[in-house]
Each structure stands twice: as structure tokens, then as C-alpha cells.
Amino acid sequence: ISIEDVEMQATLLDTPTANAIRSTLPLERTVNTWGHELYFDVGISGETEVDASTIVQIGDLAFWPPGSAFCIFFGRTPASQSNEIRSASPVNIIGSINNPPINKLRRIRTGTAIRIAVTS
């Protein structure tokens, strides 16, 4: 995952949603921000999976079905309560960033280009 000078390695899970997104890669988009979440449309539709959740962890990659959006979580969002990280509505967890560079991610603004590709 590349955003400006931020290069990150991530692991995708073997789930129907993760595999659908994997099939769209490489992908270049511009990000939107919502608190400490980056998200962008990936142009696929998907259902909310049975293990979808609104509570996520730092570094989680997720798919938000209502917005057909790929989400990168790195801290609290406007929906968070206390110290939790909460999505707007249930998301399908599709993977995670290995050692997320939280301070660098906090500098990313809406409209910044992102590129996601499979490296191995």
C-alpha cells in the first residue's frame, strides 16, 4: 500500500470479500478521511459477512458494504466511544497492515492518492 511517502506491507485474509478485492488489484484511487480512518470506493459490491463488526483494531483493513469502500483504520473515528475504534456500521475485516505507521497515516488528507498492489 503506497500513500505519498508512506509504504506499507499488508496481509489479506482468505475470505470472499478479501478475494473479491484482491481480484481488482492493482488499484489507484484518492482517499477520504473520517477521523483516523482512510477509505475509498473500490467499485465492487458485497454483502455484510456474518462475522462483520463495528469494533476494529489499529491496522485493520476492512470493506464497508454500504459505501463499497476499502477502509484502513489507524485510530479513533467520530463514531468511537472511549478508547475503541469504531466504524460507521459493520465492516468485513479483510486483512491488516504489518506495523502500521500511525504518525505518518495521521498526516494523510482527503484527496491524497493511494495505490494498492499485490507484491507476492
Predicted regions located by residue number:
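Mid-chain, well-packed structural core segment of small domains
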Residues: D51-N92
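Short, contiguous acidic and Ser/Thr-rich linear segments
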Residues: M8-T15
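Compact, glycine-rich, soluble single-domain proteins
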Residues: T24, N32-I58, W64
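Short, basic/aromatic beta-hairpin or loop at an interaction surface
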Residues: R29-V42, S82-S96
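Well-ordered alpha/beta subsegment
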Residues: R86-S120
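A short beta-strand micro-motif
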Residues: I1-I3
